């Protein structure tokens, strides 16, 4: 008998997600059972944790398990647990809304490409709502541990759901799926055993199925519950016993990801510290990767008792994409997030797990370049944060970076710093790089002309974070990183001695011209000089080593911060016909117009924009007319 019944509307995002999910994930519809058993397992973990301080929550029933049963006559499939359960408020919070920030933006990003959308929805984590892939109605009966009032939740997965108070003798949750007519394949003991064996063998508590007992004459004599999984936490088993398929299914259980992971590491450490870790590298970035408020981290167990999800303290922020768990004997069972923050054991575990994660990425890069490229394309921007956050591991982190380069003639970031160092020319002392807004802008920068002529490789950096990265990563393998856009560029032994002598002679020849140009610009430029870094372009602008670069100024602006004004050195190519022509001009107005136009062209090539483009166009039209 139900009382206090009310009908409530779904949060709008739930309705949209349900419709998209039913259509996008239908081709792999059996995952609904994995998701519901996984939720039941989590409910058991949470009860164990709460019962540490309040054993009465067990209510005399400490044998935790998940039970799967079906009724062919009613067309229902039921997944039951005796875990933590939910009260009315929790039911409304968990089953009527999606408590994830940015959900609306995520849903708006979905389009009409079903294959792509199914991957995105898989990254989002389908959870309880996956029941609607096969059911046209879902009924939930639940009672929270330690409470007397039970709750009924029911919905057809459309606009609303019903909540009511009911009686329920046992704690925990029953999820009853009223299967669609075309989904009756799941009303089969054989089919259910197959799915549970495939997806849930690793669950750390018994998964039982209702099966028929037969007497000696072969006639059905009743029903019994039979455990059909190993019921041993996967990470406590020997690595030699665990198949790749089991590791992958456990990853999906942990992360609620729809895709396989790229690689994993399962380690048991004994000695001064005792812990087991299981770390995974995902294949796809979650949709909210750059949401700093989104929780991340490892699942924490102490002595095989679940303590918390998203224990972020064990993994640095730049490795927030890592998934997995830590099971340690070195922390107390009553550990809290606050205690973790101030704990020496935590700091030691964090250092060890960070090393383990970086070694796992190194192994992936060494053993499977294609998979590593997949990783880099998804998570490279996040990993780059590490050079500013983790001084102790800076060189190891940098060795994992990949860049575009003049050597590959491709925008794909495939070149490591070790690759670059291995190809350095004899006498080359620095790793040369160029930062720009895009690969195309970098590839066509006039700053490359001299390097292309000499066949010197240059790394092309076009991610917004790159200028910040090279500010923290000043050297690699003993070789300094040097920007080729600096006015005090030094090629060392690679410099052309004859050209240097020629430049000295031209300096005298163009001396009055340079003074004239400097007089015109005044304080607008730091200085006007001749350059031999150009072959085809008449002029460029550059900055000194100790001054803010164009890209860093743009980064400040993107963060809403005011950056110091960038004052450029204006470099002119004395071998270019346009520069020679301007140097010969005697009319002051004409000279000023031409030298200004040249400066604006150089600024446009460097910054991609001008403060006053209309004036630039007017001046160009005037000089062309």
Swiss-Prot record:
The keyword Chaperone applies. Signal peptide: none annotated. The keyword Nucleotide-binding applies. CDD domains: HATPase_Hsp90-like. The lineage of its organism: Bacteria, Pseudomonadati, Pseudomonadota, Gammaproteobacteria, Pasteurellales. The gene is htpG. Residues 555-625 are annotated as: C. One of its GO terms (molecular function) is ATP-dependent protein folding chaperone. Molecular chaperone. Has ATPase activity. Belongs to the heat shock protein 90 family. PANTHER family: HEAT SHOCK PROTEIN 90 FAMILY MEMBER. It comes from the Bacteria. It is found in: Cytoplasm. Pfam families: HATPase_c_3 (PF13589), HSP90 (PF00183). Residues 1-337 are annotated as: A. Keywords: ATP-binding, Chaperone, Cytoplasm, Nucleotide-binding, Stress response. Homodimer. HAMAP family: HSP90 (MF_00505). InterPro entries: HATPase_C_sf, Heat_shock_protein_90_CS, HSP90_C, Hsp90_fam, Hsp90_N, Ribosomal_Su5_D2-typ_SF. One of its GO terms (cellular component) is cytoplasm. Residues 338-554 are annotated as: B. This is Chaperone protein HtpG.
């Amino acid at each position: 008998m139900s009382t206090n019944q009310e009908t409530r509307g779904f949060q709008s995002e739930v309705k949209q997600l349900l419709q998209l999910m039913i259509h996008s994930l239908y081709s792999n519809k059996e995952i609904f059972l994995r998701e519901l058993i996984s939720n039941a397992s989590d409910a058991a973990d949470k009860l164990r944790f709460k019962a540490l301080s309040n054993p009465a929550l067990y209510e005399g029933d400490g044998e935790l398990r998940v039970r799967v049963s079906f009724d062919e006559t009613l067309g229902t499939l039921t997944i039951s647990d005796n875990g933590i359960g939910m009260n009315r408020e929790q039911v409304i919070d968990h089953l009527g809304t999606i408590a994830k920030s940015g959900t609306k933006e995520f849903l708006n990003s979905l389009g009409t490409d079903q294959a792509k959308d199914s991957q995105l929805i898989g990254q989002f984590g389908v959870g309880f709502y996956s029941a609607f892939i096969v059911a046209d109605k879902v009924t939930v009966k639940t009672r929270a541990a330690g409470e007397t009032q039970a709750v009924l939740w029911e919905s057809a997965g459309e606009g609303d759901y019903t909540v009511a108070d009911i009686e329920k003798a046992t704690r925990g949750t029953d999820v009853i799926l009223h299967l669609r007519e075309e989904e009756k394949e799941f009303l089969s003991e054989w089919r259910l055993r197959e799915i549970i064996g495939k997806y849930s063998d690793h669950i750390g508590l018994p998964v039982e199925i209702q099966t028929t007992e037969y007497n000696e004459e072969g006639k059905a004599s009743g029903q019994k519950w039979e455990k059909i999984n190993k019921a041993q936490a996967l990470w406590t088993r020997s690595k030699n016993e665990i198949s790749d398929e089991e590791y992958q299914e456990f990853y999906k259980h942990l992360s609620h990801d729809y895709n396989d992971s790229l690689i994993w590491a399962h380690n048991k450490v004994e000695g001064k510290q005792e812990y087991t870790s299981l770390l995974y590298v995902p294949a796809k970035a979650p949709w909210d990767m750059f949401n700093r408020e989104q929780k991340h981290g490892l699942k924490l167990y102490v002595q095989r008792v679940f303590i918390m999800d998203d224990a972020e303290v064990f993994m640095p922020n730049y490795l927030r994409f890592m998934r997995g768990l830590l099971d340690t004997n070195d922390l107390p069972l009553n550990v809290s997030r606050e205690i973790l923050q101030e704990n020496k054991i935590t700091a030691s575990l964090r250092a060890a797990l960070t090393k383990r994660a970086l070694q796992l990425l190194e192994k992936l890069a060494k053993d499977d370049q294609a998979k590593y490229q997949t990783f880099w394309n998804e998570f490279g921007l996040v990993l780059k944060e590490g050079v500013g956050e983790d001084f102790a591991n800076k060189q190891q982190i940098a060795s994992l970076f990949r860049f575009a380069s003049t050597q590959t003639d491709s925008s794909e970031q495939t070149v490591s710093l070790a690759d670059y160092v291995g190809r350095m020319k004899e006498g080359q002392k620095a790793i040369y790089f160029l930062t720009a807004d895009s690969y195309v802008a970098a590839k066509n920068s006039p700053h490359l002309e001299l390097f292309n002529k000499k066949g010197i490789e240059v790394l092309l950096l076009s991610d917004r974070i790159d200028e910040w990265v090279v500010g923290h990563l000043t050297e690699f393998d003993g070789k300094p990183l040097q920007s080729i856009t600096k006015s005090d560029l030094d090629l060392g032994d690679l410099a052309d001695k004859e050209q240097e002598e020629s430049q000295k002679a031209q300096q005298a020849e163009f001396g009055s011209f340079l003074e004239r140009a400097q007089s015109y610009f005044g304080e607008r430029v730091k200085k006007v000089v001749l350059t031999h870094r150009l072959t085809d372009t008449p002029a460029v602008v550059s900055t000194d080593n100790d001054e803010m670069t164009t890209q860093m100024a743009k980064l400040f602006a993107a963060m809403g911060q005011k950056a110091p004004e960038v004052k450029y050195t204006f470099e002119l190519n004395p071998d270019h016909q346009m520069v020679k022509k301007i140097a010969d001009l005697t009319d002051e107005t004409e000279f000023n117009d031409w030298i200004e136009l040249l400066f604006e062209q150089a600024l446009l090539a460097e910054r991609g924009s001008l403060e006053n483009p209309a004036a630039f166009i007017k001046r160009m039209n005037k000089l062309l007319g």
